[in-house]
Amino acid sequence: MTSAPQSVNWKRNLFVTWLGCFLTGAAFSLIMPFLPLYVEELGVSGHQSLNMWSGLVFSITFLFSAIAAPFWGSLADRKGRKIMLLRSALGMGIVMVLMGMAQNIWQFLALRALLGLLGGFIPNANALIATQVPRNKSGWALGTLSTGGVSGALIGPLIGGLLADNYGLRPVFFITAAVLFACFVMTWFYVREQFAPVLKKDMLNGRQVFNSLKNPKLILSLFVTTMIIQIATGSIAPILTLYVRELAGDIHNLAFVSGMIASVPGVAALISAPRLGKLGDKIGPERILIAMLALSVLILIPMAFVQTPLQLGILRFLLGATDGALLPAVQTLLIYNCTNQVAGRIFSYNQSFRDVGNVSGPLLGAAVSASYGFRAVFCVTAVVVLFNALYSYWCLQRQPLKAQQRAIQQRQDS
């Protein structure tokens, strides 16, 4: 990978894209607290039907995002990443307005699918920063950038719930659209990119993209790692509140306690991601990745044996601290092992695997808990992460980019 052009102020771009990721993360999570209520308002009734439709409108966005991501990644490699940020923010803003005007569940489902097709602000922001930042600061920069989306996702549900209580459900969609339009304007004026458009006939096809990689098997293993990270995170989500109730018994503030336990991993990730990313720049992101995967296994197993919500909350905080380092480490390794020419597609493929994990994780958690109980979910998830840690270690041991070579490249880029 070549060093970033000197005329591009990557630090300013990092700040602006961090703010954009924060606004995008907040916009997406603003509507999450009342999504089932909006489904009910659109005419769906009955416990079983409400659960089914709520699950559909939630998962269809990730499904269509996984389908569309490679196309947008290819277009980003042809036209540039900034235009993809603008396209995503504007497109999602328009869809949010239409969601606020939906009259039935089928319209809403179609718009949720369209939201997935037009999304992609955060992965394109990752690709933009990864191709501009000096290599010896990649881990810190991508770790810092990841905190933007996490921060937005943490604060979004709180604000969304307050807005829905005070103004109703539909106005929240219009407020969300306004946030996304603000993100569009900010990106338009303040993000800078030097990019020479590539003719379609000069673009590498999918086979050529992988042939151009230093280690295609390593890249594929990193895609799988991204998917399993999301599976591990998502598998716990469907059972968390019920597991807290099993631990705490009948308490009057179950929703508050569950919400706190659901939020603490994000807080931990905010603290750990930049620091572990910076450490990865010194000792290598591959060491951070393997260490955090192994630590995740050691944290997941005790979760199956906790006796109180406090114990679960402490372990969830520790798990969040490890998770905060995983995706930035994967992204840093991706950019170490591909060129700027194909970075957009590599990051988009990674996003597709992430979306597959977002869909399959809750399904795995629900299936395991239905058959074997809540505690079994943590054991199964630990086994999945352990397999991934061993597989990743094997692939990283075979990669051609050794620490000495990386140190030389870092000195050249800095």
Swiss-Prot record:
Protein name: Multidrug resistance protein MdtG
NCBIfam families: PRK09874.1
Pfam families for the chain: MFS_1 (PF07690), Sugar_tr (PF00083)
Membrane-spanning ranges: 14-34, 56-76, 89-109, 113-133, 144-164, 171-191, 219-239, 254-274, 288-308, 376-396
PANTHER family tied to this protein: MULTIDRUG RESISTANCE PROTEIN MDTG (PTHR43414:SF6)
Chief location category: membrane
Gene3D superfamilies recorded: MFS general substrate transporter like domains (1.20.1250.20)
Native species: Yersinia enterocolitica serotype O:8 / biotype 1B (strain NCTC 13174 / 8081)
Gene: mdtG
UniProt keyword terms in alphabetical order: Cell inner membrane, Cell membrane, Membrane, Transmembrane, Transmembrane helix, Transport
Keyword Transmembrane helix: yes
GO cellular component, one term: plasma membrane
Family the UniProt entry places it in: Belongs to the major facilitator superfamily. DHA1 family. MdtG (TC 2.A.1.2.20) subfamily.
MF (Gene Ontology): transmembrane transporter activity
UniProt cross-references to CDD domains, sorted A to Z: MFS_MdtG_MDR_like (cd17391)
Subcellular compartments: Cell inner membrane
Topology of this chain in the membrane: Multi-pass membrane protein
